[in-house]
């Protein structure tokens, strides 16, 4: 029941949408039950598909798109949590907030980096531990402390890129062929998952980098 994502998500979507027409099975309250039984229990009738609707249900990117949305929600939580973890590390290390100053990041204005630097300043505002760094003879903090905006920020950039692509895909038509009008149908490749797949790979690397710098 796997899929390659190169011709829609035919296998998983076929299983997923069978219950809509009264076929297949539902996972209902930890039990696997026939779809017809569950529909009847809830006074629901199976959908009567019309021309091309069955193909539209299974020959698209809905499966990879659903996983992308779930992944984005988890990534957003991970990004925010990583900033908090980073700020706690700075406090525990009695580090300096100088690497998070606005002036430093306006001259290399990546959106993600600026966002993280702003968050770090806010999280560490009035920190008594950090204030103890003032007058310290140590010239610079370790890379993993100083480079939090750059590393976390790069991961945020990847997240933002994937988020933009996902918004486009959520509002797109991805089945095939496409009926343009009563007299015109176009066979194309909107079912191909590459626009999301490539960005997902890239964002997976970005997520793992959050763990790498935290481990340092």
Feature names for model-found ranges:
Residues 8-11, 196, 214:
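Short, flexible micro-motifs
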Residues 14-15, 208, 215-216:
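Small-residue-enriched alpha-helical segments and adjacent helix-cap loops
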Residues 1-107:
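Active-site cavity-forming subdomains of large catalytic enzyme subunits
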Residues 90-212:
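Accessory "access/gating" subregions that flank catalytic or transport cores
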């Amino acid at each position: 029941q796997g899929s390659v994502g190169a011709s829609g998500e035919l296998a998983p979507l076929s299983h997923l949408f069978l219950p809509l027409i009264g076929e297949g099975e539902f996972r209902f309250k930890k039990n696997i039950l026939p779809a017809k039984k569950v529909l009847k229990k809830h006074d629901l009738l199976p959908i009567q598909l019309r021309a091309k609707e069955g193909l539209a249900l299974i020959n698209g990117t809905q499966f990879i798109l659903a996983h992308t949305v779930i992944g984005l929600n988890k990534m957003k939580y991970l990004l925010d949590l990583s900033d908090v973890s980073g700020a706690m590390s700075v406090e525990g290390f009695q580090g300096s907030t100088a690497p998070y100053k606005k002036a430093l990041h306006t001259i290399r204005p990546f959106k993600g980096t600026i966002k993280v630097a702003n968050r770090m300043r806010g999280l560490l505002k009035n920190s008594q531990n950090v204030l103890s760094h003032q007058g310290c003879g140590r010239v610079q903090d370790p890379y993993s402390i100083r480079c939090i905006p750059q590393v976390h920020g790069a991961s945020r950039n990847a997240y933002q890129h994937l988020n933009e692509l996902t918004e486009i895909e959520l509002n797109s038509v991805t089945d095939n062929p496409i009926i343009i009008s009563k007299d015109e149908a176009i066979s194309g490749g909107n079912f191909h998952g590459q626009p999301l797949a490539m960005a997902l790979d890239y964002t997976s690397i970005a997520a793992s980098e959050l763990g790498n710098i935290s481990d340092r």
